[in-house]
Amino acid sequence: LKAAGIQTMSLSIDGSDAIRHDEFRGVPGTFEMTMRAVEWAHRLDLPLQINTLVTDETLPDLPAAYELMKTLGIMRWSLFFLISMGRGSGLREIGPGDSERLNHWLYDLSKTSPFQIKTTEATHYRRVAIERMLAERMDRAAIAATSVGRGFGVRDGNGIMFVAYDGTVHPSGFLPVRTGNVRSDDIVELYRTHPVFTSLRDVTTYKGRCGRCEHVRLCGGSRARAYAWTGDFLESDPLCPFVPPLASAPEQ
């Protein structure tokens, strides 16, 4: 793989030990195989990212999982906050309160962690981090220079798109809203002009709490989770408990 040009390896670990990981995955031996892959990556000097799924079941094990991560020599720990759809529909999402506490814990870890910590489908981590930085008396110029302050907001249909096995085009792999098909449509025109793509890039079209949130450009909420829960990808992310003031809608 390295000879073919692979520059980074990404593996999934959903438990702090073999018992927890294999039980969650439902396949005995996967933890051991993953640990072997970690060793292979290090032998080839491949930077390594570990992905962990955040669910109601895995949440209590995350502190122990973090201790494991510190022993693996990784460059990044990416926590994917479950969206109950597709293959994940049989799993339980965490609630808004747990999400908020987890984001604060991750921010605390980020100060001393030997690797980068990031979230997927939990952009409200950026809002938590900014609130914490302001509470620590960081000025906004300094915050803007951090990785959080340079955040890109919603990426679905905004710099990325997803093409399924049958050619169907979606704004992202987690947002299954059909916009066309590469066999019959111009993919560039779909990205540039399809109403789904243009509305995702225009945060003034967002609704509810996300639509009036001062952090919408840096966060924007999970469009995939909004779609899974409400059927409308422009609605509020139900996992974020933040209630913005009515007067804080983004500028047109």
Named regions from a protein language model:
Residues 98-143, 168-220, 225:
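C-terminal accessory region of radical SAM enzymes
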Residues 49, 78, 116-121, 162:
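A structural signal for short, well-ordered beta-strand segments and their strand-loop junctions
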Residues 205-251:
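Cysteine-cluster motifs in flexible loop/terminal segments that predominantly coordinate metals
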Residues 70-71, 75, 89-116, 150-153, ...:
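A structural motif corresponding to the C-terminal lobe/cap of the Radical SAM core domain
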Residues 154-158:
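Short, small/polar residue-rich loop motifs at catalytic or cofactor-binding pockets
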Residues 1-89, 95:
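Radical SAM/AdoMet-radical enzyme domain recognition
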Residues 71, 163-164:
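Short, acidic, Ser/Thr-enriched surface-loop or helix-capping motifs
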Residues 21, 68-87, 103-107, 120-123, ...:
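Iron-sulfur cluster-binding electron-transfer modules in prokaryotic oxidoreductases
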